[in-house]
């Protein structure tokens, strides 16, 4: 710091001279610098005169100093201990460095307070040191293995992670450990040179940064957690406390006594600490800076070895200069403290907003104000030390109050320093911070922005720029004497100046000595002429002259629309400047690339500022070149709307043009290109007319053919009588099918079919660029795969495709102007309106007879609506197609869809909200205009009206609601998808294809050994297997890509293929071509054609390809007469197959080499864009698709966030395929379906809903609402002064329990134990909700302990003891890792009571009538208050006026009696022998399990006033308490809960939640739901496991018990939607495959190339675990701290980089952009060289 800051500021803000604040303030004969001292930079603030930097003036030549001075640092010194002494500057107090405060606190907690070593044993310290040594040598695996296998001194790690391999030596001594590591290092270093070893270590260290950081964190955590006496000196260290950044230490009294006894402390020291603490009113002792410095110095001196590895680069300067030096390891402790605070340079602080008030006082900025506050505390502390220095033994100027104030000042000084540094760090963080706002998003000068407009007459790769924008932008062009014309143009621009077009803004002169001079041309014209004459003469004498001219026609610019979601959103264009234009104009064909709709959108234009960049824009970024989108490898550019409609109108079979119109259309289309093709005239392009008499007429198909033939490089040679070779040949389908021409007359139900011509035109066929049949609809003119423009792109290149689009656009627009296209009301009317109304009435009533369920009614309504739509649109339209322009637009794909036509003419249809119909309100209505519980389709949002007929107010309301819901969904989805794409961009930005075809990240780690598995570029490989295109166009494909031969069809007598002719010239070749051919042959041998492609080609040629097997029908007749027809046809086909197979294989091999992804390609960015751009189209919310195999599965953006952002799945599902199941297998599956679903305790309750004792339904309803009766339980509350007693009586059904027992495959005793454990868990959950008790303390007696149980209960009990009641599943459910959560699905049992049974009759019924309104009777089912009226919520009763509450809550005996203890009723026939639970009675006399005779269970909790008793109520006890006529299937279990008197809760909600969450423990793994979804094939389907416990381990364990010998259940094909579960159970490769499959399912409909998805999946799993694309996953593993700081949590990454002294080699994109470095990608990943020796060496090595 002393090397960059030499101006000490000693004057607080506000104390400077108001007239000259930069002048030093004189105090005691010393000059004290102010915060505005000019030695820290230029001072320029109104109303003061500007002052130059004195530091620059002293070091630079000239009296004016440096006008561009950025300033110099000053500093604020910490308090001097002896202010008046000569060495006061070197003896200062220190404060803790805020950046390293956290690390210092950890070290203080880990060290011994007395011997200043780590308290942990030496072996533990050496263990971590050797692990770091291995990591630094590039051996992270060995380092982690060392920590796993070598235990600590106490053997903790060995017990938890016992992974020692067989015959591995035991390391338990420091010397053995050191020799063990040395041996590993020697083994790894053997066999390689020293240079290779260093290179290997350097490369490995970059990829192991995260492992090293993990080891450092583990080491510090372990050393800090070591408790007890020091292992070296046996002293006991204090406890450190940190409050507000201040550290205190505190000794326990017992520890003080021990340390004093051992001599580590004296009583005097302790007394001094206690006196100071009493003075400040605290218990801890302040740990001041001098004490911290002393302790840290000794720690670094004694633990230098381990600390040097924990902080390896700490103290190293980021940039080495002459004044910088490396801090030795023994002095690195000084970096944890600060003795001075840097003051930012003066210009930086002045630019932050310095203001001057009316009194002339400078109002400082935030940083200056904070530094001034620090300086104020420094002055106060120095005053204290001055008084202390002047004090003597006989006379002291220091009082206790002053000492207290001084300590307070010291603490405040530390806090102010922390706040100052925190403000600096916060300026980096978040979106508005310096990293993301300023350093990542750079402002560019040569750019403009304006509104865009479409222009069909401009070229597709041209942009029309308004002249004002062209004058505002400039391009630097160097003047060269070898181009006189260009030199004269630049001289003319200089003379015109910046205001006249074409002109120039300024010129730049670069001399040979490196001097650069800039001359502004905003001067008078005469001066500009002089500049032009003088400087252009200098250009001829060796001076480099650069003219910054205006943008001219032909310049290249980058056109961009935000948001830039993918690569085509930023493309290169050729400029054409227009004087009258006010907006930026470009062709329609580019709208889809930018997602621009010309409704006021604005776009950006960037002008490249170098010749190299301009060349890259022209050759790599040109709009024509970006015809295919990297997301899918399919076309993204295409004509839209009016052009498509015109294409259909032009290509109708009855469309003809006369000569003048046809020639005019042809000239408009290809006129701009005729001059470029020498030798082709307009007359040669006109074909023979289709109709000769009575006058020549040409068809629209001929017009299209002329455009395609011209783009294919062919002329109209069809009249020359010779056969045409070349031109595109394709066979595709049209979007207009023959059904569009069908009509259904009024009053009829039979459709009148289309004519044969319409059927023929439904197939688009080109032969040698001649359109034979078909309509030019969206499939041919739009952005469609394998369309005519796509064929032109693949065969003739991108620029021919651009010409074709431009010609199509001009021709079709001019033709449409002649034809016209408008929409009339007749186009929306139907023929048979009465039938429409009748069918819609039937649709409205169709849901009346079906259950009111979404899954039943909605599909039925949708199917019927679809049938109506198919009948009416387009068959029953008043104006038929193609005269109906509404149908013309929707069917051809020009605008809208069939749904829009249906809504305009027929009906609006069903309105959906998140995929569901509108729901009913609390009034059981969907809208006030409908009836209660109405089930008609209209009431659920089906709009019967159309836009032509009008809609009703209710339909309008629901339609508006659905539109609003969609807008909200879009708004939320935009932010979610934007964050998703940003995370993907950051996580994948550094993935680049390297020279060896591998994909590596910035760390050098290999992500993929071959990009995408095959190394092919998605755009280049999109048509690699388009065999039909290659076969039909083999001549042109061979011309473009080369090959040994291509097909040549000659007219042989038998019509067979005449053979193959050579396409290459075998004469003398130039050297360049020879080298290229040699390189191609070498590459073909290195990368041969894969067998899969060869097999695919053979299958196509043998099974799918069509060949002309004959030319004359007479030939067939002759073969048939000789009975050789089949044989001859097969022979001819085999000849064609043989002729094509070798040729196409050779071409495909060459095309595959050409399609390999180029080194330097940023495939990571392309993959992130491919996944991020379609995510904007995904639905946001979770939805359930009808018929889906896995229901309730998160889809869309939430699912993507689970997979990529969080790497955690909320609702996992395991799918197991089933194929060809037999009847026996079906029985096993049915058994599994019953046994696999988790049984809930609420399924066993007898839910009584009828009134008892002849009571009315109303009274029964009141009872249900008040007491929970009807839910299967009853509760009662008794409140007293000392506590509250809650009695919950559960009514269970024996038959339901027995059915569950059979379903769960358990013995009677096991199931009874499961039942009691479930009861205990329910009580735990209730008590936890009431008292917030985290876990049960202990059981009151032996009866509450259920003991062991078959099926692994001991293991379950151990897990329960370890996990507590949070496991939810009890001691058995916890075995399978289940957690307490709401179960989604379950099986509800019947009520379990016959109609003749009743509860509470007789005595209970008579007592109900005598109850008072204040609830004086408090007995429940166990007593006689069956219908006792309580408050509305039934949760808490008042203790006042209740004669039973106080005594009941206070009397423990009464509390025990309320539980209905069986011990009290043993004489009533119970089979219980005692309370110890030694004999549970087995089963009852009826052979059913005795669920009602278990011993009472006592439970106590951590709070003494909380407890519970669970006991069954015997039949005799129930009868004695008033419960009569209890059905023999039912029994009652009482749970009496004792809580504090101040507990307030809604008892029904608490009990309901506990019952719903509790499952019956089972020895079998259990799941939330288990379904079998059948497929179309008989006996085939899928087993789907969902809910808690749906893991692969549980599913496999469950299936292994049922599938022995069953082959139909494919266990090896089981798959889980939880990627981590798959990776843990099967291995990380299985996790990768599962993640890839999940991504493929999500992006399948968006045609995302599999290579992108595989790269994303590989990036997420390549480190052996499933990592997210967030700061806790992929981002955290990067070795670039600058890259991490630009993502999120800047403070965290900055602290780690500073504390660990991490460096950044700028390999990542973000780090390179931050510092202005060119990212090493694309053309920047290679270096161009003109050295002929290098070229000769390459040629000799590869082609000699």
Curated annotation (Swiss-Prot):
Biased composition (Gly residues): 1341-1354, 1366-1376
Region (Disordered): 1333-1484
Annotated residues for binding of Zn(2+): 56, 69, 72
SMART domains hit by this protein: RPOLA_N
UniProt entry keywords in alphabetical sequence: DNA-directed RNA polymerase, Magnesium, Metal-binding, Nucleotidyltransferase, Nucleus, Phosphoprotein, Transcription, Transferase, Zinc
Residues binding Mg(2+): 597, 599, 601
Enzyme Commission number(s) from the entry: 2.7.7.6
Feature: compositional bias, Basic and acidic residues: 1464-1478
Keyword tRNA processing: no
Bridging helix, as annotated region: 953-965
GO biological process: DNA-templated transcription
Gene Ontology CC: mitochondrion; plastid; RNA polymerase I complex
Post-translational modification note: Phosphorylated.
Subcellular localization(s) per the UniProt record: Nucleus, Nucleolus
Pfam family of the protein (one): RNA_pol_Rpb1_5
GO MF terms, alphabetically ordered: DNA binding; DNA-directed RNA polymerase activity; metal ion binding
Catalytic activity annotation: RNA(n) + a ribonucleoside 5'-triphosphate = RNA(n+1) + diphosphate
Protein family according to the UniProt entry: Belongs to the RNA polymerase beta' chain family.
Subunit comment: Component of the RNA polymerase I (Pol I) complex consisting of at least 13 subunits.
Function: DNA-dependent RNA polymerase catalyzes the transcription of DNA into RNA using the four ribonucleoside triphosphates as substrates. Largest and catalytic core component of RNA polymerase I which synthesizes ribosomal RNA precursors. Forms the polymerase active center together with the second largest subunit. A single stranded DNA template strand of the promoter is positioned within the central active site cleft of Pol I.
PANTHER family found in the cross-reference section: DNA-DIRECTED RNA POLYMERASE (PTHR19376), DNA-DIRECTED RNA POLYMERASE I SUBUNIT RPA1 (PTHR19376:SF11)
The name this protein goes by in its record: DNA-directed RNA polymerase I subunit RPA1
Organism for this UniProt entry: Trypanosoma brucei brucei
């Amino acid at each position: 710091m002393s090397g960059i800051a030499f101006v000490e500021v000693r004057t607080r803000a506000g104390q400077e001279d108001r007239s000259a604040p930069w002048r030093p303030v004189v105090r005691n004969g010393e000059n004290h610098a102010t915060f505005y001292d000019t030695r820290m930079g230029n001072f320029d603030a109104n109303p003061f005169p500007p002052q130059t930097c004195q530091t620059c003036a002293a070091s630079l030549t000239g009296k004016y100093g440096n006008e561009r001075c950025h300033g110099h640092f000053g500093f604020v010194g910490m308090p001097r201990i002896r202010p008046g002494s000569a060495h006061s500057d070197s003896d200062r107090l220190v404060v803790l460095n805020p950046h390293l405060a956290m690390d210092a606190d950890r070290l203080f907690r880990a060290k011994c307070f007395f011997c200043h070593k780590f308290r942990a044993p030496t072996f533990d310290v050496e263990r971590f040191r050797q692990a770091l040594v291995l990591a630094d040598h590039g051996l992270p695996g060995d380092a982690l293995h060392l920590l796993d296998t070598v235990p600590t001194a106490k053997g903790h790690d060995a017990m938890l992670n016992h992974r020692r391999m067989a015959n591995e030596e035991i390391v338990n001594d420091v010397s053995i450990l050191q020799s063990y590591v040395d041996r590993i290092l020697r083994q790894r270093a053997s066999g390689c040179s020293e240079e290779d070893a260093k290179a290997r270590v350097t490369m490995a260290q970059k990829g192991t940064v995260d492992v090293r950081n993990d080891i450092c964190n583990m080491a510090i955590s372990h050393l800090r957690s070591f408790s007890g006496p020091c292992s070296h000196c046996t002293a006991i260290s204090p406890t450190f406390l940190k409050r507000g950044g201040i550290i205190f230490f505190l000794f326990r009294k017992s520890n003080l006594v021990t340390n004093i006894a051992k001599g580590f402390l004296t009583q005097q020291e302790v007394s001094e600490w206690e006196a100071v603490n009493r003075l400040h009113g605290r218990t801890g002792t302040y740990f001041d800076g001098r004490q911290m410095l002393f302790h840290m110095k000794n720690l670094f001196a004694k633990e230098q070895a381990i600390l040097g590895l924990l902080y390896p680069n700490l103290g190293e300067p980021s940039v080495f200069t002459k004044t910088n030096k490396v801090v030795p390891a023994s002095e690195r402790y000084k970096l944890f403290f600060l003795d001075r605070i840097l003051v930012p340079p003066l210009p930086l602080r002045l630019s932050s907003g310095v203001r001057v008030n009316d009194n002339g006082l400078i109002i400082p900025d935030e940083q200056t104000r904070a530094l001034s506050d620090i300086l104020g505390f420094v002055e106060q502390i120095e005053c204290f030390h001055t008084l202390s220095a002047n004090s003597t033994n006989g006379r002291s100027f220091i009082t206790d109050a002053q000492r207290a104030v001084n300590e307070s000042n010291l603490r405040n000084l530390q806090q102010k320093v922390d706040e100052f540094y925190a403000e600096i760090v916060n300026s980096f963080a978040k979106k508005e911070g310096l990293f993301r706002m300023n350093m990542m998003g750079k402002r560019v000068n040569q750019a403009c922005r304006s509104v865009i407009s479409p222009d069909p007459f401009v070229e597709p790769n041209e942009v029309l720029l308004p002249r004002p924008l062209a004058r505002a932008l400039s391009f630097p062009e160097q003047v060269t004497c070898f181009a006189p014309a260009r030199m004269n143009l630049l001289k003319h621009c200089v003379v015109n100046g910046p205001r006249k077009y074409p002109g120039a803004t300024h010129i730049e002169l670069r001399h040979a000595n490196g001097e650069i001079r800039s001359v502004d041309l905003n001067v008078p014209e005469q001066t500009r002429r002089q500049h032009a004459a003088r400087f252009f003469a200098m250009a001829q004498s060796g001076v480099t002259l650069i003219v910054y001219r205006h943008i001219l026609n032909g310049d290249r610019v980058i056109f961009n629309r935000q948001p830039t979601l993918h690569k085509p959103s930023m493309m290169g264009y050729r400029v054409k400047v227009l004087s009258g234009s006010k907006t930026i104009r470009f062709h329609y064909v580019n709208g889809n690339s930018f997602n621009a709709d010309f409704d006021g959108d604005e776009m950006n234009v960037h002008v490249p500022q170098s010749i190299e960049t301009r060349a890259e824009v022209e050759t790599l970024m040109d709009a024509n070149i970006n015809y295919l989108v990297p997301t899918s490898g399919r076309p993204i550019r295409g004509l839209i709307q009016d052009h498509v409609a015109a294409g259909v109108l032009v290509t109708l079979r009855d469309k003809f043009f006369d000569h003048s119109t046809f020639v005019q259309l042809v000239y408009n289309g290809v006129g701009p290109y005729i001059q470029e093709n020498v030798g082709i005239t307009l007359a040669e392009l006109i074909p023979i007319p289709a109709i000769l008499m009575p006058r020549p007429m040409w068809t629209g198909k001929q017009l299209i053919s002329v455009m395609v033939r011209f783009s294919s490089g062919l002329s109209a040679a069809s009249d020359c009588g010779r056969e045409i070779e070349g031109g595109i040949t394709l066979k595709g389908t049209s979007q207009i099918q023959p059904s569009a021409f069908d009509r259904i007359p009024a009053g009829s139900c039979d459709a009148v079919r289309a004519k044969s011509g319409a059927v023929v035109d439904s197939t688009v066929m080109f032969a040698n660029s001649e359109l034979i049949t078909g309509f030019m609809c969206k499939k041919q003119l739009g952005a469609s795969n394998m369309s005519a423009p796509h064929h032109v792109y693949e065969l003739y290149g991108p620029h021919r495709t651009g010409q074709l689009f431009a010609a199509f656009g001009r021709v079709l627009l001019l033709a449409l102007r002649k034809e016209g296209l408008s929409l009339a009301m007749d186009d929306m009317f139907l023929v048979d309106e009465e039938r429409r109304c009748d069918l819609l009435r039937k649709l409205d009533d169709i849901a009346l007879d079906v259950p009111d369920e979404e899954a039943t009614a909605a599909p039925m309504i949708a199917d019927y609506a679809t049938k109506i739509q198919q009948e009416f649109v387009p068959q029953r339209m008043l104006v038929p197609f193609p005269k109906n322009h509404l149908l013309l637009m929707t069917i051809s794909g020009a605008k809208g869809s069939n749904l829009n036509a249906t809504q305009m003419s027929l009906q609006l249809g069903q309105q959906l909200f998140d995929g569901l119909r509108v729901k009913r309100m609390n009034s059981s209505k969907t809208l006030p205009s409908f009836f209660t519980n109405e089930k008609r389709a209209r009431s659920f949002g089906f709009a019967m009206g159309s836009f032509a007929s009008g809609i009703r107010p209710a339909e309008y309301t629901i339609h508006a609601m659905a539109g609003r819901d969609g807008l909200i969904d879009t708004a939320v989805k935009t932010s979610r998808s934007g964050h998703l794409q940003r995370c993907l961009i950051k996580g994948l930005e550094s993935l680049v294809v390297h020279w060896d075809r591998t994909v590596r990240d910035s760390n050098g780690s290999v992500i993929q050994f071959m990009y995408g598995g095959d190394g092919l570029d998605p755009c280049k490989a999109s048509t690699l297997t388009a065999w039909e295109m290659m076969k039909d166009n083999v001549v042109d494909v061979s011309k473009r890509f080369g090959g040994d031969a291509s097909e040549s069809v000659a007219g042989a007598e038998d019509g067979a293929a005449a053979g193959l002719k050579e396409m290459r010239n075998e004469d003398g070749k130039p050297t360049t071509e020879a080298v290229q051919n040699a390189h191609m042959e070498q590459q073909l041998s290195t990368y041969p054609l894969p067998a899969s492609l060869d097999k695919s080609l053979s299958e196509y040629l043998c099974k799918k390809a069509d060949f002309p097997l004959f030319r004359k029908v007479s030939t067939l007749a002759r073969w048939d007469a000789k009975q050789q027809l089949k044989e001859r046809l097969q022979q001819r086909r085999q000849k064609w197959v043989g002729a094509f197979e070798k040729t196409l294989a050779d071409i495909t091999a060459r095309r595959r080499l050409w399609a390999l992804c180029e080194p330097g390609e940023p495939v990571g960015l392309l993959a992130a864009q491919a996944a991020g751009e379609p995510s904007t189209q995904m639905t946001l919310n979770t939805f359930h698709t009808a018929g889906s195999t896995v229901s309730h599965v998160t889809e869309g953006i939430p699912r993507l966030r689970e997979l990529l952002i969080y790497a955690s799945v909320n609702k996992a599902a395991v799918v197991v395929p089933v194929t060809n199941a037999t009847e026996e297998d079906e029985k096993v599956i049915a058994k599994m379906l019953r046994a696999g679903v988790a049984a809930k305790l609420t399924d066993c309750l007898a839910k009584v809903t009828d009134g008892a004792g002849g009571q009315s339904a109303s009274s029964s309803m009141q009872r249900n609402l008040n007491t929970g009766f009807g839910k299967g339980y009853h509760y009662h509350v008794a409140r007293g002064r000392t506590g509250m007693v809650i009695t919950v009586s559960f009514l269970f059904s024996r038959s339901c329990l027995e059915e569950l027992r059979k379903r769960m495959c358990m013995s009677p005793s096991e199931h009874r134990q499961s039942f009691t454990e479930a009861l205990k868990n329910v009580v735990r959950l209730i008590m936890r909700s009431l008292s917030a008790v985290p876990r049960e303390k202990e059981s009151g007696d032996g009866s509450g302990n259920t003991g062991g149980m078959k099926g692994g209960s001991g293991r379950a009990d151990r897990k329960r003891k370890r996990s507590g009641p949070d496991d939810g599943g009890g001691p058995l459910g916890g075995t399978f890792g289940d957690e307490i959560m709401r179960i989604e699905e379950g099986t509800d049992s019947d009520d379990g009571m016959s109609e003749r049974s009743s509860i509470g009759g007789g005595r209970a019924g008579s007592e109900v009538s005598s109850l008072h309104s204040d609830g004086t009777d408090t007995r429940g089912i166990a007593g006689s208050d069956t219908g006792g009226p309580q408050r509305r919520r039934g949760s808490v009763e008042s203790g006042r006026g209740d004669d039973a509450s106080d005594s009941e809550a206070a009397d423990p005996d009464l509390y025990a009696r309320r539980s209905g203890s069986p011990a009290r009723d043993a004489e009533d026939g119970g089979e219980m022998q005692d309370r110890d639970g030694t004999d549970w009675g087995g089963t009852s006399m009826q052979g059913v399990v005795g669920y009602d005779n278990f011993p009472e269970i006592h439970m106590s909790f951590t709070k003494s006033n909380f407890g519970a008793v669970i006991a069954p109520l015997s039949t005799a006890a129930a009868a004695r308490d008033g419960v009569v006529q209890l059905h023999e299937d039912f029994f009652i279990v009482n749970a009496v809960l004792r809580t504090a008197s101040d507990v307030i809760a809604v008892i029904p909600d608490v009990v309901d939640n506990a019952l719903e969450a509790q499952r019956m423990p089972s020895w079998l793994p259990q799941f939330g739901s288990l379904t079998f979804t059948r497929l179309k094939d008989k006996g085939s389907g899928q087993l789907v496991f969902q809910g808690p416990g749906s893991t692969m381990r549980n599913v496999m364990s469950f299936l292994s018990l049922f599938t022995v010998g069953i082959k139909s259940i494919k266990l090896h094909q089981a798959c889980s939607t939880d990627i981590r579960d798959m990776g843990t159970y099967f291995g990380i490769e299985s996790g990768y495959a599962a993640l890839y499959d999940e991504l493929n399912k999500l992006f399948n409909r968006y045609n995302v190339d599999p290579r992108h998805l595989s790269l994303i999946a590989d990036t997420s799993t390549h480190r052996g675990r499933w990592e997210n694309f967030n700061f806790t996953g992929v981002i955290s593993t990067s070795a670039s701290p600058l890259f991490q700081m630009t993502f999120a949590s800047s403070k965290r990454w900055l602290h780690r980089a500073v504390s660990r002294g991490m460096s950044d080699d700028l390999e990542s994109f973000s780090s390179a952009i931050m510092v202005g470095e060119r990212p090493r990608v694309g053309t920047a990943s290679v270096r161009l060289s003109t050295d002929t020796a290098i070229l000769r060496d390459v040629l000799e090595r590869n082609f000699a």
